């Protein structure tokens, strides 16, 4: 029984050890991550963003940010750890090793006179005749007397010095660090131990696995339902106009789960009257169009109206119940739009290409939702393909302000950005009638807006020229600069109630055939991850081309410096198409800012497949053909559409207006082509 009690006393130590093995490293990782967080402000500092409250770190927010499940679990485990440490430290002395020298307060090897002197001193303190305390009596009999006997008896002392115990050599004893009730073989401990093992080691993990799998089976890795991806895949069309993307977007299964209450009917009717002009309804048959709109699934109607409330900035009139649904719709929007974009660029054609037109529409819808700008504001105005939408994302700007500054020949958003600070301040105060504080807010937002440049190349590694069927390596450096010097930052989005990171989508596409050859998402917030990815990609590319160690290290070092300077590397592989010249466009589309997209022309010449022995050479006829095609290429460049305009002003009958649209694009694009001549020349150098 004593042995079982001793083993039971070891059970807290066993639990303490098992808990400390994962808990201590995990705590160190959490603390290092918390201490390494940058304190630099990366969000907008204008008054509108400040009033939104999403960046304010109040006491409640600090507590809520700390009170996550992982942090609370961590604190609870440390409380248990501290309790076990205290309990272990104050365990019964019966579990301690018998050491007569330490009991008498002596050092090993002392003389008999010192032993007797120590015994007399302790007897005065603990002897029953001197101290009536029962605990003192017990300690004197069980420890002090035995220790004195072990050290004064010659045989006992010799055994202690040789074997560490007064009784001589002791047998080796092993036990199980389990509670005593589980080691009581006379009772029902066998069944309890069996139930404990089965419950903790088998049933508990099984129940957790079943619950996790039953919930996760409905979702993908991006926490989007499989049903949503299926709907997006089948509803996506190659000719889907940006104005029609909303109809596909609202078909998400997550939005179908938002409850539709009878009390929502009247508020939704009022909201419908406020946003009716943004719903693409036919004005000639308004009654029929309204009836058709309300015949849709109630969840779809509710979702679309709530999104329109965000686009038109009418969320303030929503009832408290609809406010919760409104926040839920916007909370799901970023990841649903990302998956919708992936469904647009997923390989559809025989050549493995996606569709450009719906992809651009998804990005434009994302921009409008984040900036709370109506889709109708994106209608091209002749000078700007984005309409007045870039102006409306600035604080204190409205349609009236845009009309006022347009009288001073500020026709496009680029004109406003390129003005000198003094001229812009004078324009906004004297012409637009804004206050000095309003102008200061506008300047803060303009300093936050990114400027993107793209340097892209396509080549076959280790070969001269690209031949049909080759595996082509695409390499693009996307560089971001802001007037305030930040690289990674959160956008100005005072009407979007959640934190939204800037994401950029790099699309290599053929605007004429509506094909997307390559797509990849780029983020500028994670510099460490970008350095790791760029180093790995450059290293593999250099090693594949047969470069030496020094050349590889130099290339990796150069790539790291570029990443630290605000660039991100985009690399991918694609198969070369049939022989011909392809006028491609590299789109770099931002999903948060309007008017910050970048389009870079890229001309790719694919040569005819030659015999196996001459793969790396360009034939003389090919060189002559290239020289002869230069004049023809110059003519083609004049007609090349380098600016993929927004198409929210199109009607449903798109096929009938296609020829007129192409003609208007050529007319409006002639002036822009001169501005992009440098990019065309850089594209021709990649031939």
Swiss-Prot record:
Phenotype caused by lack of the gene: Male gametophytic lethal due to defect in pollen germination and pollen tube growth.
Matching Pfam families: DnaJ, Sec63
InterPro entries: C2_domain_sf, DnaJ_domain, Ig_E-set, J_dom_sf, Sec63-dom
Organism this protein belongs to: Arabidopsis thaliana (Mouse-ear cress)
Cell compartment(s), UniProt: Endoplasmic reticulum membrane
Database matches in SMART domains: DnaJ (SM00271), Sec63 (SM00973)
Role according to the record: Required for integral membrane and secreted preprotein translocation across the endoplasmic reticulum membrane.
Primary residence: endoplasmic reticulum
Annotated glycan sites: 90
Composition bias, Acidic residues: 623-654
Record's keyword terms, sorted: Chaperone, Endoplasmic reticulum, Glycoprotein, Membrane, Protein transport, Transmembrane, Transmembrane helix, Transport
Signal sequence extent: none
Subunit structure: Interacts with OEP61/TPR7.
Lineage top rank: taxon: Eukaryota
Spans annotated as Disordered: 619-687
Lumenal side: 1-8, 87-190
Segments crossing the lipid bilayer: 9-29, 66-86, 191-211
Record protein name field: DnaJ protein ERDJ2A
Induction line: By tunicamycin.
Any single GO BP term: protein transport
Record-annotated SEC63 domain positions: 205-603
Membrane topology, record value: Multi-pass membrane protein
Gene Ontology CC: one annotated term: mitochondrion
């Amino acid at each position: 029984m004593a042995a079982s009690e001793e083993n039971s006393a070891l059970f807290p130590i066993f639990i303490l050890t098992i808990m400390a093995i994962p808990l201590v490293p995990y705590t160190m990782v959490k603390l290092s991550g918390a201490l390494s967080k940058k304190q630099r402000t990366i969000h907008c500092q204008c008054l509108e963003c400040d009033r939104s409250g999403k960046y304010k770190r109040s006491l409640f927010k600090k507590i809520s940010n700390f009170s996550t499940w992982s942090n609370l679990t961590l604190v609870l485990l440390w409380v248990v750890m501290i309790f076990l440490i205290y309990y272990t430290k104050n365990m019964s002395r019966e579990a301690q090793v018998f050491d007569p020298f330490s009991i008498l307060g002596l050092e090993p090897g002392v003389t008999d006179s010192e032993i007797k002197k120590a015994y007399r001193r302790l007897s005065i303190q603990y002897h029953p005749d001197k101290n009536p305390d029962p605990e003192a009596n017990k300690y004197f009999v069980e420890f002090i007397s035995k220790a004195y006997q072990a050290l004064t008896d010659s045989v006992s002392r010799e055994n202690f010095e040789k074997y560490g115990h007064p009784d001589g050599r002791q047998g080796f004893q092993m036990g199980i660090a389990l509670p005593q009730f589980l080691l009581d073989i006379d009772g029902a401990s066998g069944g309890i131990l069996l139930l404990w093992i089965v419950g903790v080691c088998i049933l508990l993990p099984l129940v957790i696995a079943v619950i996790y799998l039953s919930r996760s089976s409905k979702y993908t890795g991006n926490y989007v339902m499989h049903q949503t991806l299926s709907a997006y895949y089948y509803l996506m069309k190659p000719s889907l106009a940006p104005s029609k993307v909303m109809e596909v977007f609202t078909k998400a299964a997550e939005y179908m789960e938002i409850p539709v209450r009878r009390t929502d009917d009247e508020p939704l009717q009022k909201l419908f009257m406020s946003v009716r002009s943004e719903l693409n309804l036919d004005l000639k048959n308004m009654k029929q169009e309204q009836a058709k709109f309300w015949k849709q699934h109630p969840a779809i109607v509710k979702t679309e109206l709530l999104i329109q409330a965000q686009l038109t900035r009418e969320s303030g009139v929503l009832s408290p119940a609809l406010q919760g649904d409104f926040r839920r719709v916007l909370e799901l929007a970023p990841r649903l739009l990302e998956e919708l974009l992936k469904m647009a660029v997923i390989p559809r054609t025989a050549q493995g290409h996606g569709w450009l037109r719906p992809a651009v529409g998804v990005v434009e819808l994302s921009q409008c939702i984040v900036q709370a700008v109506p889709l109708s504001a994106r209608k091209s105005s002749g000078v700007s393909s984005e309409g007045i939408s870039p102006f409306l994302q600035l604080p204190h700007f409205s349609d009236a302000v845009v009309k006022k500054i347009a009288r001073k020949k500020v026709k496009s958003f680029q004109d406003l950005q390129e003005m000198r600070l003094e001229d812009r301040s004078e324009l906004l105060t004297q012409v637009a009638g804004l206050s000095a504080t309003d102008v200061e807010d506008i300047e803060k937002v303009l300093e936050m807006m990114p400027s993107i440049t793209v340097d892209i190349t396509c080549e076959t590694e280790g070969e001269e020229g690209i031949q049909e069927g080759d595996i082509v390596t695409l390499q693009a450096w996307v560089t971001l600069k802001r007037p305030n010097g930040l690289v990674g930052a959160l956008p100005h989005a005072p009407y979007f109630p959640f934190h939204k990171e800037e994401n950029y989508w790099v699309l290599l596409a053929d605007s004429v055939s509506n094909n997307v050859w390559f797509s990849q998402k780029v983020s500028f917030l994670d510099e460490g991850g970008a350095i790791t990815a760029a180093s790995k990609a450059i290293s593999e590319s250099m090693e594949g081309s047969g470069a030496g160690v020094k050349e590889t290290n130099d290339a990796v070092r150069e790539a790291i410096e570029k990443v630290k300077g605000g660039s991100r590397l985009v690399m991918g592989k694609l198969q070369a198409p049939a022989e011909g010249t392809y006028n491609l466009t590299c789109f770099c589309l931002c999903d948060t800012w309007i008017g910050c997209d970048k389009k870079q022309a890229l001309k790719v010449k694919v040569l005819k497949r030659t015999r196996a022995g001459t793969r790396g050479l360009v034939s003389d006829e090919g060189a002559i053909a290239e020289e002869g095609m230069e004049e023809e290429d110059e003519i083609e460049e004049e007609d090349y559409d380098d600016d993929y305009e927004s198409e929210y002003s199109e009607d449903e009958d798109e096929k009938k207006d296609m020829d007129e649209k192409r003609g208007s694009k050529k007319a409006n694009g002639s002036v822009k082509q001169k501005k992009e001549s440098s990019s065309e020349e850089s594209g021709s150098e990649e031939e």
